[in-house]
UniProtKB/Swiss-Prot annotation:
HAMAP family named in the record: NDH1_NuoD (MF_01358)
InterPro entries with a match to the protein in the record: NADH_Q_OxRdtase_suD, NADH_UbQ_OxRdtase_49kDa_CS, NDH1_su_D/H, NiFe-Hase_large
Name of the protein in question: NADH-quinone oxidoreductase subunit D
Chief location of this protein within or outside the cell: membrane
Function, as annotated: NDH-1 shuttles electrons from NADH, via FMN and iron-sulfur (Fe-S) centers, to quinones in the respiratory chain. The immediate electron acceptor for the enzyme in this species is believed to be ubiquinone. Couples the redox reaction to proton translocation (for every two electrons transferred, four hydrogen ions are translocated across the cytoplasmic membrane), and thus conserves the redox energy in a proton gradient.
Membrane-topology annotation of the record: Peripheral membrane protein
Keyword Membrane recorded: yes
Length: 417
C-alpha cells in the first residue's frame, strides 16, 4: 500500500479566524500540524516610508492606523520619541490624561481580543458582551477627539485639548423610544470624568460576567489548557513581550520597569502566568483589565483635583487654541505654518517604547535637523509573536492552530506596516 504523505492546506487570508489578512500555509499529517508558514505583507502600506515625506505632526494620524485596535498607544510611543529628541517637558495633567487614555485603549484592545478569541473557540456569547462595554469606551474617545477610533488626540508636548465638561446625549429616534434614550443618557449628565468614573464602578462586574462564561467552562479549558505552551526562557529568546511574555511567568512590564508619562505615580500590579499556555495568557489579560480599571480610577481622581495646562507652552511645537485662532490673525498664521511646515527637530536619534496592549511597541526615530524624520522604524510586538507560530502550533491539531492565532492577539496593521 502506498505511503500517505503530508498535505498542504492554505488557511486564510479570507478566513474569519485569520484576524485580518493572515495567510498560513499549513503542512498537515492528518489533522496534526507539522509546519506552519505565515505569509505576511497583504496589508503593507509603507507607513515608515510615508513618514519620511511628512512633517512630524502630519505623520501622527498614520500611527492610529498601525494597530487599529489600540490607537492611542501607538500615538503615545510616537509622541514620546519626538519629545525625547526635542527635550521638552510635558505638563503633569497631560501625562495623567495620556496614562488614562492609554489604559482605556488597553481595555478596548483586550475586550476586542477576548470577544474574538472566545468566538474563534466556539463561544459567540462573549463577543456580544465585550462589544457592549467597547461602546462606552468609544464614547470616551469621541468626547475628546470627535472620532470613535482614529483619534489623533495625543500631540508632541501633551494632548490636543482638555477633557470636556459635558457628554453628548442620545436623542429619541425611530429605533429607540424615550424610555430607552433616558436610560442611555442616565450616566451622561455630567462631565467626561463623571462618565469615566461611572464606567470604572460598573466594569468589574462586567469582567466577572466574562469570567463566569469562560474561566471554569470545561470546553474553554479543553481548547486552551496545554495549547501553545512557551516556557519562560524560550519566550525571552523568541522576543516575546507583553501578555505573551507575562503568561510564561516573567513579570516584565515597561510601565513598571521603564515608567513613562504618569505610570510612576499610579499603583497597580503586574499579573503573570505559570505554565505559559493559552489559558494562562487568557487569565493574564483578564486580570490586566482589572488593573487597567484601577489605574483609570486613580487618574480620574487626580484629574478632578488638579486643573492645569494640557500641552507644552513651547509655541514652536504647540499650536494655538481653536478659540484664539478664530479671533486673531497672528494665531491663524501660527497654526497654518505649524501644520504645513511643521517644526524642526535637532539632529540625532531616539527610541521610545510603551507597554502596548500587545507588548513592547517601539518607535526608533532618526532626525537630520529637518522638519520631517530622516528614518522612522516601528517595532511592532505582533511581528515577533507571529514569527513564533510555527513553533507553537507544531504537533497540535488544526483546530488548535486557530486558538493559538487567537491567543497571540495579532493585528496586521502593525505587522505589515
Amino acid at each position: 500500500m502506498a505511503e500517505i504523505k503530508n498535505y498542504s492546506l492554505n488557511f486564510g487570508p479570507q478566513h474569519p479566524a485569520a484576524h485580518g489578512v493572515l495567510r498560513l500555509v499549513l503542512e498537515l499529517d492528518g489533522e496534526v500540524v507539522q509546519r506552519a508558514d505565515p505569509h505576511i505583507g497583504l496589508l503593507h502600506r509603507a507607513t515608515e516610508k510615508l513618514a519620511e515625506h511628512k512633517t512630524y505632526i502630519q505623520s501622527l494620524p498614520y500611527m492610529d492606523r498601525l494597530d487599529y485596535v489600540s490607537m492611542m498607544c501607538n500615538e503615545q510611543a510616537y509622541c514620546l520619541a519626538i519629545e525625547k529628541m526635542l527635550g521638552i517637558e510635558v505638563p503633569l495633567r497631560a501625562k495623567y490624561i495620556r496614562t488614562m487614555f492609554g489604559e482605556i485603549t488597553r481595555l478596548l484592545n483586550h475586550l476586542m481580543w477576548l470577544g474574538s478569541h472566545g468566538n474563534d473557540c466556539g463561544s459567540s456569547t462573549i463577543l456580544i458582551y465585550t462589544f457592549r462595554e467597547r461602546e462606552d469606551l468609544f464614547d470616551m474617545y469621541e468626547a475628546v477627539s470627535g472620532a470613535r477610533m482614529h483619534a489623533a488626540y495625543f500631540r508632541p508636548g501633551g494632548v490636543y485639548r482638555d477633557l470636556p465638561d459635558s457628554m453628548a446625549q442620545y436623542k429619541v429616534s425611530k429605533i429607540k423610544n424615550a424610555k430607552a434614550i433616558e436610560e442611555l443618557n442616565r450616566n451622561r449628565q455630567g462631565s467626561l470624568l463623571d462618565f469615566i468614573d461611572d464606567f470604572t464602578q460598573r466594569f468589574p462586574k462586567c469582567v466577572d460576567e466574562y469570567e463566569t462564561l469562560l474561566t471554569d467552562n470545561r470546553i474553554w479549558k479543553q481548547r486552551t489548557v496545554g495549547i501553545g505552551v512557551v516556557p519562560a526562557e524560550r519566550a525571552l529568546n523568541l522576543g516575546m513581550t507583553g501578555p505573551m511574555l507575562r503568561g510564561s511567568g516573567i513579570a516584565w512590564d515597561l510601565r513598571k520597569k521603564q515608567p513613562y508619562d504618569a505610570y510612576d505615580r499610579v499603583d497597580f500590579d503586574v499579573p503573570v502566568g505559570v505554565t505559559g499556555d493559552s489559558y494562562d495568557r487568557y487569565l493574564v489579560r483578564v486580570q490586566e483589565m482589572r488593573e487597567s480599571n484601577r489605574i483609570i480610577k486613580q487618574c480620574v481622581d487626580w484629574l478632578r483635583a488638579n486643573p492645569g495646562p494640557v500641552i507644552t507652552d513651547n509655541h514652536k511645537i504647540a499650536p494655538p487654541s481653536r478659540e484664539a485662532m478664530k479671533s486673531n490673525m497672528e494665531e491663524l498664521i501660527h497654526h497654518f505654518k505649524l501644520f504645513t511646515e511643521g517644526f524642526r527637530v535637532p539632529a540625532g536619534e531616539a527610541y521610545a517604547a510603551v507597554e502596548h496592549p500587545k507588548g513592547e511597541f517601539g518607535i526608533y526615530m532618526v532626525s537630520d535637523g529637518a522638519n520631517k524624520p530622516y528614518r522612522l522604524k516601528i517595532r511592532a510586538p505582533g511581528f515577533a509573536h507571529l514569527a513564533t507560530l510555527d513553533e507553537m502550533a507544531r504537533g497540535h491539531m488544526l483546530a488548535d492552530a486557530v486558538a493559538i492565532i487567537g491567543t497571540m492577539d495579532i493585528v496586521f496593521g502593525e505587522i505589515d506596516r
